[in-house]
């Protein structure tokens, strides 16, 4: 989907930090005609943003909600300025079906416009170690302490343990129950 350049960390914040990876698997061939993933190479190596100073600037002494549009925009704008000052430019990533892109939590990335009628189907996941607590903006900006352990239960598939969430949700306006995935 078309998305402005961003880092996932404000809405996918782990403690200790950066203990996850983004994984994007192409189901269709993707080029400039159907909205490729855009990445800013080396943006994950930039110095950290002072999120406490940013919190004071955006929220003052007020509360920070788990999904704050103001907190999201302020952070992403700060990262964009850092990338520009460092001379880093976004690059489109063209892929074939089955190609997998794995990225660091601090990599600035987004989805380019999709000008054609063609599809750009993909599967996107964020993967953490087992029991890794994940917080949102209230944790990212330091208002809410990070949980010591993730609250979800796991089920076993062979030697793997998979978190049981029950719904697909990443702070979007919608959630989707996962029972329909089991019918296939």
For each of these PLM feature ranges, what is it?
Residues 17-20, 55, 72, 120:
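A structural signal for well-ordered alpha-helical scaffolds and beta->alpha junctions
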Residues 5-8, 77-86, 119, 138-143:
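Short, surface-exposed loop/helix-turn segments at secondary-structure junctions
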Residues 7-10, 24-25, 87-89, 107-110:
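Glycine-rich, charged/polar anion/phosphate-binding loops
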Residues 54-57, 97-102, 106-184:
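Non-heme Fe(II)/2-oxoglutarate
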Residues 22-26, 90-92, 100-102, 122-124:
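Conserved hydrophobic/aromatic beta-strand scaffold that supports enzyme active sites
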Residues 33-108:
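Double-stranded beta-helix
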Residues 14-16, 36, 49, 112-114, ...:
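Short, function-defining helix-loop hinge/capping sites that tune catalysis or transport
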Residues 1-40, 44-46:
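Conserved double-stranded beta-helix
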């Amino acid at each position: 989907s078309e998305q402005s350049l961003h880092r996932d960390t404000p809405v996918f914040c782990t403690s200790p930090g950066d203990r996850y990876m983004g994984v994007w698997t192409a189901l269709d061939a993707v080029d400039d005609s159907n909205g490729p993933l855009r990445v800013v190479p080396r943006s994950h190596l930039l110095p950290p943003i002072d999120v406490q100073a940013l919190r004071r600037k955006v929220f003052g002494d007020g509360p920070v909600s788990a999904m704050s549009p103001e907190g999201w925009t302020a952070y992403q704008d700060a990262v964009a300025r850092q990338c520009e000052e460092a001379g880093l430019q976004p690059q489109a990533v063209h892929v074939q079906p089955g190609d997998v892109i794995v990225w660091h939590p601090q990599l600035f990335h987004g989805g380019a416009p999709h000008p054609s009628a063609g599809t750009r189907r993909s599967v996107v996941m964020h993967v953490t170690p087992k029991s890794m607590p994940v917080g949102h903006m209230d944790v990212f900006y330091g208002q809410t302490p990070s949980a010591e352990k993730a609250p979800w239960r796991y089920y076993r598939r062979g030697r793997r343990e998979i978190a049981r969430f029950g719904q697909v949700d990443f702070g979007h306006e919608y959630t989707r129950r996962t029972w329909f995935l089991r019918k296939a």
